[in-house]
Amino acid sequence: MTASLKAIDGSAELATLMHDLGRRARAAARVLALASPEQKNRALEAMERAIRAGADKILAANAEDVADANASGANSAFLDRLTLTPARVEAMAEGIAVVRGIPDPVGAVTESWQRPNGMTIERVRVPLGVVAVIYESRPNVTADAGVLCLKSGNAVILRGGSESFRSGRAIHDCLVQGLREAGLPEAAITLVPTRDRAAVGLLLGGLNGSVDVIVPRGGKSLVARVESEARVPVFAHLEGVNHVYIDRSADLDMAKSIVLNAKMRRTGVCGAAETLLIDRAAADTHLAPLVAMLIDAGCEVRGDAIVQHADARVKPATDQDWDTEYLDAVIAAKVVDDVDDAIVHIHDHGSHHTDAIVAEDAQTAAKFLGEVDSAIVLHNASTQFADGGEFGFGAEIGIATGKFHARGPVGAEQLTTFKYRIHGTGQTRP
């Protein structure tokens, strides 16, 4: 079912619409759970073609969304997340191709063992069922979530942000075309066809048992609302208050390259670094060059007293800066006593998303990787690798920062659960 914008007359009509979407998605999930890998891949291949063929329509729809956002005074970071370019549309199509090429997780036997009574027990991957994805300004999430749920045998209900509705609708049309060509139900990938914010509340209620899990993808307030109000399980994608720690053993050239990429490659993504921590023993040699490099690249640096002393252009940091996801060309910077002090700071101010250490000393790096309690920890690499595509997942539905079921980039495999399959030869329990 392609999504056309619907005018809703009152809460009762909206509830009827949403519950109907839920029932259709539940029926589609039963079909997808039994679909062969070949049929799902045919749909993905058709979606890839449709995205490329429909690029002009997608970009035109996105231009309207961006124009509205500009007129409403959206900041540069928001506009970057909202904007599609020919390269980003092509990357969307390439991501679908990668997802098509990964092994189908459904039906995979992850463990198998035989009991003394002769029974064989297998642990087998199965779809979750119906996934609801609630997201804000990123139109590419429409494609990422749709194709990952399809690959993993799940139906999905997509509720994108009102600011990206036209873009999401154009992308969704391409996904539905792929489902059609492969003979799969169109309700397998459903886009909520209204901007009415009350639709979110209905999704959080689970649509009378139609929704099995909710994935929020957006700012702190959205995720907090979902976690507070959801009556079904949630894969929480929290904000990325990400750190790069520069150890006393760090190579300066490597540190400069990693810090610049981690902060400035794309400032509006959840994997961007937001705080720079520098070992006090490295401050004399590393601090000033790193700060100057960032400022010269157009990044505002907010630092403690030592960082301010290193460069007159540094602005004073407040307590709030250590807890802020800027999603902009701003970074907080602080000198810490050592790796232990860095770990304490990350524990107190981080969001359990992504944190990196730059160090040549293997023992220090191992300590950091072992003790920092984040979904992704990196040694001598940029935090911007916090991305499902970079993990080889093809795409991601989000970065889960909780500890249950899925953690880190949520790809097709993470969108499955399991059942136990037992083979006997007539055994009965004594």
Swiss-Prot record:
Record key words, sorted: Amino-acid biosynthesis, Cytoplasm, NADP, Oxidoreductase, Proline biosynthesis
Coiled coil: none
Enzyme class: oxidoreductase
CDD domains referenced in this protein's UniProt entry, alphabetically: ALDH_F18-19_ProA-GPR (cd07079)
EC number: 1.2.1.41
Keyword Glycosyltransferase set for record: no
One of the record's GO cellular component terms: cytoplasm
Amino-acid biosynthesis among keywords: yes
Major location category of this protein: cytoplasm
One Pfam family matching this protein: Aldedh
GO MF, any single term: glutamate-5-semialdehyde dehydrogenase activity
Any one biological process term the GO annotation gives: L-proline biosynthetic process
Reactions the enzyme catalyzes: L-glutamate 5-semialdehyde + phosphate + NADP(+) = L-glutamyl 5-phosphate + NADPH + H(+)
InterPro entries: Ald_DH/histidinol_DH, Ald_DH_C, Ald_DH_N, Aldehyde_DH_dom, G-glutamylP_reductase_CS, Glu-5-SA_DH, GPR_dom
Pathway(s) of this molecule: Amino-acid biosynthesis; L-proline biosynthesis; L-glutamate 5-semialdehyde from L-glutamate: step 2/2
Subcellular location: Cytoplasm
Matches recorded under PANTHER family: DELTA-1-PYRROLINE-5-CARBOXYLATE SYNTHASE (PTHR11063:SF8), GLUTAMATE SEMIALDEHYDE DEHYDROGENASE (PTHR11063)
Role of this protein: Catalyzes the NADPH-dependent reduction of L-glutamate 5-phosphate into L-glutamate 5-semialdehyde and phosphate. The product spontaneously undergoes cyclization to form 1-pyrroline-5-carboxylate.
Family indicated by similarity: Belongs to the gamma-glutamyl phosphate reductase family.
Name of the protein in its database record: Gamma-glutamyl phosphate reductase
Organism: Rhodopseudomonas palustris (strain HaA2)
Gene symbol of the encoding locus: proA
